[in-house]
Amino acid sequence: MAKKSLNESSPVARFEQSLEELEQLVQKMEVGEMSLEQSLTAYERGIGLYRDCQQALEQAELRVRLVTDPARPEQAEAFEPPSLDGG
């Protein structure tokens, strides 16, 4: 049986590319040398990239749940990342 390949247009397949572009956009905006119009355009693009990344993470979490317990994906425990505040 052939292995399934990720659809190149899926958010999961584009996650790293979107995250890298978002990081570059933030760096450019932090420099503060953009015009107001450029800043607004960059902000709008950043929001779109953020949403793409969030959707990719949600889809990846669902895939993990399905692999963990394919018979009962609705009862699989949600992944809770460790707290960054040390608590």
Curated annotation (Swiss-Prot):
Disulfide-bond pairs as recorded: none
Cell compartment(s), UniProt: Cytoplasm
Keyword Hydrolase set for record: yes
Keywords for the protein's UniProt record, in alphabetical order: Cytoplasm, Exonuclease, Hydrolase, Nuclease
EC number: 3.1.11.6
UniProt xrefs under InterPro entries: Exonuc_VII_S (IPR003761), Exonuc_VII_ssu_sf (IPR037004)
Domain of life per record: Bacteria
A single MF term (Gene Ontology): exodeoxyribonuclease VII activity
Subcellular location, principal: cytoplasm
Swiss-Prot/TrEMBL GO biological process terms: DNA catabolic process
Subunit (UniProt): Heterooligomer composed of large and small subunits.
Protein name (database record): Exodeoxyribonuclease 7 small subunit
Organism, as annotated: Xanthomonas campestris pv. campestris (strain ATCC 33913 / DSM 3586 / NCPPB 528 / LMG 568 / P 25)
